[in-house]
Curated annotation (Swiss-Prot):
S4 RNA-binding domain mapped to chain residues: 89-169
Keyword set, alphabetical order: Chloroplast, Plastid, Ribonucleoprotein, Ribosomal protein, RNA-binding, rRNA-binding
Pfam families: Ribosomal_S4, S4
NCBIfam families linked: PRK05327.1, rpsD_bact
Assembly notes: Part of the 30S ribosomal subunit. Contacts protein S5. The interaction surface between S4 and S5 is involved in control of translational fidelity.
Protein name: Small ribosomal subunit protein uS4c
The UniProt record lists the keyword Signal: no
Location(s) in or outside the cell: Plastid, Chloroplast
Amino acid sequence: MSRYRGPRFKKIRRLGALPGLTSKKPRSASDLRNQSRSGKRSQYRIRLEEKQKLRFHYGLTERQLLRYVRIAGKANGSTGQVLLQLLEMRLDNILFRLGMASTIPGARQLVNHGHILVNGRLVDIPSYRCKPRDIITTKDKQGSRALIQNHMDSSSNAELPKHLTLHSFQYKGVVNQIIDSKWVGLKVNELLIVEYYSRQT
């Protein structure tokens, strides 16, 4: 299953705010209530919608998300929390959380087009897993810096999560530590997502 490229507002009306996909939000709570009036949601549908929130927010294909779930399941600790940490530490998401891109798809384009360095080396893989003490910068070119500046000028003044530091005048971000679960950028019930996949196998 490929990445979603359809109307973004259609997804946030069904699933709620997806800041990684779009800065738009449902116009009112009634947008979400209207979706639920078609009937009582089954437990399967509730789990499915939580999974879809995660997939659309981070811009993943179904296959990619399943791979992350399997990696998280083999790691020490809570599978759901490890899953969120893996997704939050992706390079495209780190750029988004730093405010260097307005959405995760926008961050993915910056990486794909060769504008981003990690520890001084060009990285063109959006799924690159960032680690504590990684330093993320833009290429020292006017075009690259102009793109980042435009994003930073237009980005909402969201509170920067504690695991990141932004030096905006240097177009530089620093990963201080692995993200704590309370700083994850999406309201989602990760346990329902783990349950969804456990019932598919």
